[in-house]
Amino acid sequence: MARRRSQRVCASGPSMLNSARGAPELLRGTATNAEVSAAAAGATGSEELPPGDRGCRNGGGRGPAATTSSTGVAVGAEHGEDSLSRKPDPEPGRMDHHQPGTGRYQVLLNEEDNSESSAIEQPPTSNPAPQIVQAASSAPALETDSSPPPYSSITVEVPTTSDTEVYGEFYPVPPPYSVATSLPTYDEAEKAKAAAMAAAAAETSQRIQEEECPPRDDFSDADQLRVGNDGIFMLAFFMAFIFNWLGFCLSFCITNTIAGRYGAICGFGLSLIKWILIVRFSDYFTGYFNGQYWLWWIFLVLGLLLFFRGFVNYLKVRNMSESMAAAHRTRYFFLL
């Protein structure tokens, strides 16, 4: 039985060697199975070596042939592994599920990193765990580079006193909560409402007065109607008194002061009284006014009224101007 097993091993050795050398593109699983079967056959042959060795030696060197065949099987398995390891991968990105743990791996890094976008091929090693750890540690490093800076590195600008003053000027500080939420009583609310209505009414009346009599800022003091002085009053008075109605028109139209106009009125009234007396006591007009005394009295009273009106109004205006000397740009209008 032992001789038959050794012959079977010797016969199967060359066939296994030829199959291992002739099929280098077989999968890793076939090479591994051949290696395992060769090891099992070698172990069986080594256990029964003493009787088999004698048989092989007696049979013309069958024992060395079996040893050579087992060695050839091991060499063929190694060549098969090398050929499989050197075979190019048609698809680098796809991993073959039939390959064992000693195959090739492709580590995919962060796609956002343009500098490391190409695939990195790692050689087959027995311990790929440190490389995976290194790749995993490089990925968080890239993520931490894009993270925001810590809060301690951010500098906060403290507003200065000038900025605070400017902010307080444009944005006043609101009152405290106790003051803002405290409601006034009914009497206080009514008083505040009455005061607001009075202020609004005063403002409305002042606005209406300004609209009705707008101030004329385009006039200067020389163009305004001023009071005048006593000299202008006497000049206009004598012009109207001497030249009668012609002097009255000239003095009233030329002068632009209250004194000149009231002086012209006063002089014209006195001139009218003068001519009434002349006509009454003259011998030239005895035939015209002897029976018409009422007409004389009418002109005499009219002259007296004009004289006293001009003189009295001028005195009132002068006294008023002296009492209101502090008022600036005041205008006086008096009707004749």
From Swiss-Prot:
Biased composition (Low complexity): 37-48
Induction section of the entry: By T-cell activation.
Record localization: Endosome membrane; Golgi apparatus membrane; Endosome, Multivesicular body membrane
Alphabetized CDD domains for the sequence: NDFIP2 (cd22306)
Entry protein name: NEDD4 family-interacting protein 2
PTM comment, free text: Ubiquitinated by NEDD4 and ITCH. Also ubiquitinated by NEDD4L. Ubiquitination by NEDD4 or NEDD4L does not affect turnover. Undergoes transient tyrosine-phosphorylation following EGF stimulation, most probably catalyzed by SRC. Phosphorylation on Tyr-151, Tyr-171 and Tyr-177 are dependent on the phosphorylation on Tyr-167. Also phosphorylated by LYN and FYN.
Protein's GO biological process: metal ion transport; negative regulation of gene expression; negative regulation of protein transport; negative regulation of transporter activity; positive regulation of canonical NF-kappaB signal transduction; positive regulation of protein ubiquitination; ubiquitin-dependent protein catabolic process; vacuolar transport
Motif (PPxY motif 2): 174-177
Comment, domains: The PPxY motifs are required for E3 ubiquitin-protein ligase activation and for ubiquitination.
Keyword entries, A-Z: Endosome, Golgi apparatus, Membrane, Phosphoprotein, Repeat, Transmembrane, Transmembrane helix, Ubl conjugation
Quaternary structure, from the entry: Forms heterodimers with NDFIP1. Interacts with HECT domain-containing E3 ubiquitin-protein ligases, including NEDD4. Interacts with NEDD4L. Interacts with PTEN. When phosphorylated at Tyr-167, interacts with SRC and LYN SH2 domain. May thus act as a scaffold that recruits SRC to NDFIP1, enhancing NDFIP1 phosphorylation. Interacts with SLC11A2/DMT1. May interact with phosphorylated EGFR. Interacts with KCNH2.
Annotated spans, Disordered: 1-24, 37-156
UniProt cross-references to InterPro entries, sorted A to Z: NEDD4/Bsd2
Domain of life assignment: Eukaryota
Mode of membrane association: Multi-pass membrane protein
Residue stretches of biased makeup (Basic and acidic residues): 78-99
GO molecular function ontology, one term from the record: WW domain binding
Motif (PPxY motif 3): 184-186
Site (Not phosphorylated by SRC): 186
